[in-house]
From Swiss-Prot:
It comes from the Viruses. The C-terminal zinc-binding domain is involved in binding to IFIH1/MDA5. This domain is also involved in viral pathogenesis. Keywords: Host cytoplasm, Host-virus interaction, Inhibition of host innate immune response by virus, Inhibition of host IRF3 by virus, Inhibition of host MDA5 by virus, Inhibition of host RLR pathway by virus, Interferon antiviral system evasion, Metal-binding, Phosphoprotein, Viral immunoevasion, Zinc. The P/V/C gene has two overlapping open reading frames. One encodes the P/V/W proteins and the other the C/Y proteins. Changing residue 319 to W: 80% decrease of in vitro zinc binding. Attenuates viral pathogenicity in mice. Changing residue 337 to S: 50% decrease of in vitro zinc-binding. This is Protein V. Its main location: host cell. The gene is P/V/C. Zn(2+) 2 binds at residues 341, 353, 355, 358. It is found in: Host cytoplasm.
Length: 384
């Protein structure tokens, strides 16, 4: 009887409303926003306001109502089409109980999911019951019924005060792993690693680990001065031997023209240029000797050897020049004399005296029978 009376009452209310009104989804969203906007601390209080009718300014289309004697179910009428009033009353009578049960289940699931998503990160359990005053204990037991340990209390304290974690990180303090047991100390010299790794602890403090120190300008200058004092030529060795007391220095090289005293090693130009910061590299001064060089009497490959320097014109006499070549299967060696004051050429030829003091015939060319080529110089020599 009560159910029939309730259906008749709802039908009369639907008839008083405008026919063809549609249920808007914004009413359900508004109801969920009103529930979710409440603080978590107010859930344990009186929640009888959840069973009151929510009046929204949506017009005749909103039909959310709650039964005063029910279990918190929200009744929503079925969606009406633009049909006649008689058809809407018949369809309302037949589908009213099913729509109420289905809408109530959907609202309960939505409310439970909304509260579970918002308070899922906290360790406080939410109780959405029938509407009674179900308070939450300050320190409720865990899932197995045992009282909470000190670690869980510390986790709750850190969740309630998130600024404390930021202060610890700003001060450079190590952040301990929550819910893990710290390893015991390995002795007086070892430090506790607080469960971070299984490596043996070192003697230094874990609070100083990973702290970067910005060097001051004074520290940088001290490092630069220390690096400058280090010798840069530690791996190099001087080319000349150093003077050792009680030992005799080696004789001077005949190519060395520096003229240093015998008790002191020869000095080079590089010693005056090098400073204390650059590595000492000594280069020997190799200057060509002053004077004439001995000229070989035998030319190579049929050509006379050019020593590269002018001969001394003060030395009077002749020099012997040779040319060796092959003729008709025989090796022919021809030789002749030229004045010493003349220039040595690559192409063998007779040269005249430049100083006008060299003899025309010497003991080397006295036995010559023929000349290499019949030039006036040869005729003059053999004629005389």
């Amino acid at each position: 009887m009560d159910q029939d009376a309730f259906i008749l009452k709802e039908d009369s209310e639907v008839e008083r409303e405008a026919p063809g009104g549609r249920e808007s989804l914004s009413d359900v969203i508004g109801f969920l926003d009103a529930v979710l906007s409440s603080e978590p601390t107010d859930i344990g209080g009186d929640r009888s306001w959840l069973h009151n009718t929510i009046n929204t300014p949506q017009g005749p289309g909103s039909a959310h109502r709650a039964k005063s004697e029910g279990e918190g179910e929200v009744s929503t009428p079925s969606t009406q089409d633009n049909r006649s009033g008689e058809e809407s009353r018949v369809s309302g009578r037949t589908s009213k109980p099913e729509a109420e049960a289905h809408a109530g289940n959907l609202d309960k699931q939505n409310i439970h999911r909304a509260f579970g998503g918002r308070t899922g990160t906290n360790s406080v359990s939410q109780d959405l019951g029938d509407g009674g005053d179900s308070g939450i204990l300050e320190n409720p037991p865990n899932e197995r019924g045992y009282p909470r340990s000190g670690i869980e209390d510390e986790n709750r304290e850190m969740a309630a005060h998130p600024d404390k974690r930021g202060e610890d990180q700003a001060e450079g303090l190590p952040e301990e792993v929550r819910g893990s047991t710290s390893l015991p100390d390995e002795g007086e010299g070892g430090a506790s690693n607080n469960g971070r790794s299984m490596e043996p602890g070192s003697s230094h403090s874990a609070r100083v680990t990973g702290v970067l120190v910005i060097p001051s300008p004074e520290l940088e200058e001290a490092v630069l001065r220390r690096n400058k004092r280090r010798p840069t030529n530690s791996g190099s060795k001087p080319l000349t031997p150093a003077t050792v007391p009680g030992t005799r220095s080696p004789p001077l090289n005949r190519y060395n023209s520096t003229g240093s005293p015998p008790g002191k090693p020869p000095s080079t130009q590089d010693e005056h240029i090098n400073s204390g910061d650059t590595p000492a590299v000594r280069v020997k001064d190799r200057k060509p000797p002053i004077g004439t060089r001995s000229v070989s009497d035998c030319p190579a490959n049929g050509r006379s050897i050019h020593p590269g320097l002018e001969t001394d014109s003060t030395k009077k006499g002749h020099r012997r020049e040779h040319i060796i070549y092959e003729r008709d299967g025989y090796i022919v060696d021809e030789s002749w004399c030229n004045p010493v004051c003349s220039r040595i050429r690559i192409i063998p030829r007779r040269e005249l005296c430049v100083c006008k003091t060299c003899p025309k015939v010497c003991k080397l060319c006295r036995d010559d029978i023929q000349c290499m080529r019949p030039d006036p110089f040869c005729r003059e020599i053999f004629r005389s």
